[in-house]
Amino acid sequence: MSLAAMGDAAAATAPVNDYKALVCVFLYGANDHGNTVVPYDSTNYASYANIRAALATPYSQLLPLTPDVALPSGAQMALAPQLTGLKSLFDAGAMGVMLNVGTLVVPTTLAQYKAQSVPLPPKLFSHNDQQSVWQSSLAEGATSGWGGRLGDLFLNQNGTSTFTCMNVSGNAVFVSGQQAVQYQVSSSGAVKLNATASNAFGSSAVSKAMLALSQGSSSRWMENEHARIMARAIQAEAQLSSGLAGVPALSTPFNASNPLAMQLQMVARTIAARGAMGTKRQVFFVSLGGFDLHDNLVAQHPGLLTRISEALSSFHAATVELGVANQVTTFTASDFGRTLTSNGDGSDHGWGSHHFVVGGAVAGKRFFGKLPVTAVNGPDDVGQGRLLPTTSVDQLGAALATWFGVADSDLPTVFPHVRNFAAGTLPLFR
């Protein structure tokens, strides 16, 4: 889509008077979904334990889920023992579980995959490539992500468009749009520009020169562009810092030793300052790494799950405190799933995975999508217990985007493959 076309789409977006935020929690390295959402009925747990061998979580430690809509054929699922906070959210109806979602170009059967008779996502099982595809719905090297393209549609709805797409964890294509530029902050607030500090690079003269450059004009195009970018950055830093300073501290506790929790605390603080910043639609990106557990899975994965549970439950509690729980939806994402089979000490690169969707507007206490068969060489297995996704990232994203306020006619501008799938959105929301 051209910049002009995207601009026309943004201009055509119906005015919004409420506030909504989407928060992507990306789990870098590929979370082991097999030990995150676990079969609990006796038949499927026995199959799981047999396949996973030493990786299997003991049955007595699992946290069983009782959904409002039962799974077919008497199937039951449970959460890992470390996910107590998420279990509480599920039981309260504030969280749903998205089953077997992954990157797809078109609906794909096992026979089609084996015959290579339909287009497949590029370079399956590759971290960099699949991170890019998950975040952009395009091939690795994409310059815009679907979170950023959502932001493109709502730039003119925000008083300051700079705060439409925000990243609290560095740089990610997910929140880069064709017009929207991701604004990066730290867990403690706006990142101060060294060049505008009172003593930049050890010299007050340098600071004065940089400030003058940002405020002046020149016959040289590059100098003017630099000045424009610097001026925008200085203004955004001041506006965000002022907005954060003007809201009361959150009473909801966040674990300061949990980096994901601190990122989400910053998101909550930014949402609290939405009035001062004039924002009505925002897309946030946070992340946690360390999930590529080819070995030491039993030792290391539980600690990562604890961080996820702590962070997401604290963040949801903060949205309740701020009175915006129904206006904020958080979802997890990852490179891909992992093999159900064990390599002896861990699991290897997979494809489909299970994910969480959290928020007051979510039709919680439910499973969404199709439950895969727990079996190696089964109907959902492309090899070694790698799940063939039955719900595409585009379908999941389209459901989130529809809740966000995107018209059906605009969905293909954000999700290039969504028209390849059945019409209608996943029933993620009330």
Region locations from a protein language model:
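Metal-dependent active-site segment of extracytoplasmic phospho-/sulfohydrolases and closely related
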Residues: 319-344
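Catalytic phosphate/nucleotide-handling subdomain of diverse soluble enzymes
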Residues: 346-347, 356-358, 362
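Feature for exported/extracytoplasmic and membrane-associated proteins, marking the mature portion
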Residues: 1-321, 341, 357-358, 366-430
